[in-house]
Amino acid sequence: AVTLNVLHISAYNLIYEEGTALWRMREKGLVKECEEEESLQMFETLIDVLGFSGYEHYEISNFARSGRYAFHNTSYWKGVPYLGLGAAAHSYDGKSRRINPSSLSEYMEALQTGHVAYMEEKETVDSLYNEYILTSLRTCWGLNLKKLEDDFGVERMRYCLEQALPHIC
């Protein structure tokens, strides 16, 4: 990827999903899962190589050159509303999350008949608070205490600080 001079790299740890070809290959012994220590060493090497090659490590699994961050993912991590179109697409309006059917035929049928085909999950203040903290801590921008206070109140901001202080060097 470095020699191809790509502007953005997403590098996720490989997982084995039950029911997939890769899962079956592992079960048959055709591929071997890495030990956790080896996986950690490979990730640290990736961070070093990409950093040396001019990539900014801006989120746990994402690297970019020249500030070319993934727009959709950055919006997600910062809690910005977004619209997902198509089968299996996700949307967020600031208050709820919607997931379109994963089956293309089911999605198309719903569109043609004018029916609402998505599943909706209403967010609670607690879920929004927890998600903001967890997604913020994944990024190089970290947690914005002013935003935390503005969006969730001074008590929740103080609680977050109280919980974090023992872990700050």
In which residue ranges do the predicted regions lie?
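C-terminal scaffold of the Radical SAM
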Residues: 1-154
